[in-house]
Curated annotation (Swiss-Prot):
Disulphide-bonded residues: none
Function summary: Catalyzes the attachment of proline to tRNA(Pro) in a two-step reaction: proline is first activated by ATP to form Pro-AMP and then transferred to the acceptor end of tRNA(Pro). As ProRS can inadvertently accommodate and process non-cognate amino acids such as alanine and cysteine, to avoid such errors it has two additional distinct editing activities against alanine. One activity is designated as 'pretransfer' editing and involves the tRNA(Pro)-independent hydrolysis of activated Ala-AMP.
Annotated organism of origin: Synechococcus elongatus (strain ATCC 33912 / PCC 7942 / FACHB-805) (Anacystis nidulans R2)
Main location: cytoplasm
A GO CC term attached to the entry: cytosol
Annotated protein name in UniProt: Proline--tRNA ligase
Length: 600
């Protein structure tokens, strides 16, 4: 391709809208163009990158026996209502674009396709003889992000590969899940990316197990906690660990004490000369279910720990049926205004105890009249602890569960921290890294098939629900994440496997007929050898061309400059900036060798 004929415009300054390096560089280098908030045009160079990523994904999926398909982007609300996710996606999380057609039928623009594919399987899969099946697609998805940011990282429109598998039993599901795990590792390696597979929360997708694939980058939105022995890695939302040991309490007698002005852990510990690990603090939450009911929640947790709201949301979702609901649509720490709406009288905030009476809740048919009481293991194991007395300026010391307070249901709700000990080996401590979630695989189990009545006939003639898995990769996110992982002050450094072109031939002086002729010959020879090559034949200064070549990140640059008089050209490797002068006749072989060494 000749740059003189390409729609190719670069920018010298960083666009004001861009926050992270990869977003700045993709805009500056002419890969993408912003159309609206979270919506981008993929320009010719970017489209080549996306096609390459898609092809690697396609090849690895096909190698597992998965079958490519294409599902509708417009999805009827009825399917999502069957699964119970319509309210979650259109109201609670609010991430689905929804609309009414001219017959006033509700539709959604698909952020994901579990419901559609389950409906297809329900209609077409009848017998165990048809199982297992694994179907995938690569297409545009939509999410109504509250705050689109970081370019293609968190957009409202994006390209994704999603696959869905169907099985007769859980063992078959596990086998496909393992195959997808390996396929994803192959994909990211072939794309030339550094990544880490981590345990993950299943979120609104649901299911019994899931794993994320994180592309390591300082600008990653996700925090990963891992051990140096390589045996544990998890998203902080999912991570578990052993916290620091609690210091033994000096309070051996249960008594109420006046503790004026101690409504924080720090002030309380200073007043009592105690350690935060000896304190049980109460954290108030309120949850709203999809049936409109508000549930007051009282969490007891050790004083030096914090509540992981993802873990709490998951626990509430598991308990939703106990309150006549299907899901949680909001979880918040109530502020003063919110408390006025459901408390019978002002609460002694900062002095709450585990036995805060249910009578503190106002009588209202939309409010569940009893606290959901949960205790984190860090607090459940404490003895002779300090906690609130449910009275302003008073605490109790020397308290014990069951003796002084009923012990609530014990649930892991704490946020794991850097420096915590690992559960698999207490000599290992958790370290932290930032990552960009680029892939996610789930064992969905029976969640969707049971909800939507997708069954098959077993070998014994009985009707059973299908076991399901789903497996996603953000194709457009992978492309930008590659830039976030590999760039320098001069521009992008593409991995060779997904670079839009593998080589660029630069003519420093377009009026020099010898330079032009040599460049044309090299360009033709490289192209004939199957090397994807750009020819920079623009009428621009040499310095502009060199800066643009660095900016757009083509792996190998060939310059037909002054060395031509000796029958040689300069070749530059973008990643290392290593430059050498070689014979014109050696260019094709040299570039071929570099490409072969770079591509896994």
């Amino acid at each position: 391709m000749r740059l003189s004929q390409m729609l190719f415009v670069t920018l010298r300054e960083d666009p004001a809208e861009a926050e992270i390096p990869s977003h700045k560089l993709l805009l500056r280098a002419g890969y993408i163009r912003r159309i609206a908030s979270g919506i981008y045009a993929y320009l010719p160079l970017m489209w080549r990158v996306l096609r390459k990523v898609s092809q690697i994904v396609r090849e690895e999926m096909d190698a597992t026996g998965a079958q490519e398909t294409l599902l509708p982007q417009l999805q009827p609300a009825e399917l999502w209502q069957e699964s119970g996710r319509w309210e979650t996606y259109t109201k609670a999380e609010g991430i689905m674009f929804s609309l009414d057609d001219r017959q006033q039928r509700q539709l959604g623009l698909g952020p994901t396709h579990e419901e559609v594919i389950t409906a297809v399987a329900r209609d077409l899969i009848r017998s165990y003889r048809q199982l297992p099946q694994n179907l995938y697609q690569i297409q545009t998805k939509f999410r109504d992000e509250i705050r689109p940011r970081f370019g293609l990282m968190r957009g409202r429109e994006f390209i994704m590969k999603d696959a869905y598998s169907f099985h007769a039993d859980e063992e078959s599901l596990r086998q496909t899940y393992a195959a997808m795990d390996q396929a994803y590792r192959n994909i990211f390696r072939r794309c030339g990316l550094q990544f880490r597979a981590v345990e993950a929360d299943s979120g609104a997708i649901g299911g019994s197990a899931s794993q994320e694939f994180m592309i390591l980058a300082d600008a990653g939105e996700d925090e990963i906690l891992y051990t140096e022995d390589g045996r544990y890695a998890a998203n902080v939302e999912k991570a578990v660990s052993l916290p620091a040991e609690a210091i033994a309490s000096a309070f051996t007698t249960f008594e109420k004490r006046e503790t004026p002005g101690t409504d924080t852990i720090a002030s309380l510990c200073e007043f009592l000369k105690a350690d935060p690990t000896q304190v049980v603090k109460q954290v108030l939450y309120q949850a709203v279910f999809d049936n409109g009911k508000l549930l007051p929640i009282l969490i007891s947790i050790r004083g030096d720990q914090s509540v992981n709201e993802i873990k709490l949301t998951n626990e509430l979702t598991r308990r939703a049926a106990d309150y006549g609901a299907k899901t949680v649509i909001a979880l918040t720490v109530p502020d003063a205004e919110a408390l006025k709406k459901w408390t019978a009288a002002p609460l002694p905030l900062g002095y709450l105890g585990p036995d805060l009476a249910d009578s503190a809740i106002a009588v209202n048919e939309s409010i569940i009249p009893k606290f959901l009481r949960l205790v984190d293991p860090t607090a459940a194991e404490l003895q002779n602890f300090v906690t609130g007395a449910n009275e302003v300026n008073f605490h109790v010391v020397g308290a014990n569960w069951e003796t002084n307070f009923p012990k609530p249901a014990v649930v892991d709700l704490r946020t794991a921290l850097v420096g915590d000990r690992a559960q698999h080996d207490s000599s290992q401590v958790l370290a932290s890294a930032r990552g960009i979630e680029a892939g996610h695989i789930f064992q969905l189990g029976l969640k969707y098939s049971q909800a939507m009545g997708a069954t098959f006939t077993t070998e014994n003639g009985t009707e059973e629900p299908l076991w399901m898995g789903c497996y996603g990769i953000g194709v457009s996110r992978v492309a930008q994440a590659a830039v976030e992982q590999s760039y320098d002050k001069d521009g992008i450094i593409w991995p060779v496997a997904i670079a839009p072109y593998q080589a660029v031939v630069v003519i420093p002086n377009i009026t020099d007929t010898e330079q032009v002729a040599a460049a044309e010959k090299i360009y033709a020879d490289l192209t004939a050898a199957g090397i994807e090559t750009l020819l920079d034949d623009r009428d621009e200064r040499a310095g502009v061309k060199f800066k643009d070549a660095d900016l757009i990140g083509i792996p190998y640059r060939i310059v037909t400059g002054r060395s031509l008089k000796e029958g040689k050209v300069e070749v530059v490797q973008r990643a290392s900036k290593e430059s050498s002068v070689i014979a014109v006749g050696s260019v094709v072989e040299t570039v071929q060798d570099w490409i072969a060494a770079a591509i896994v």
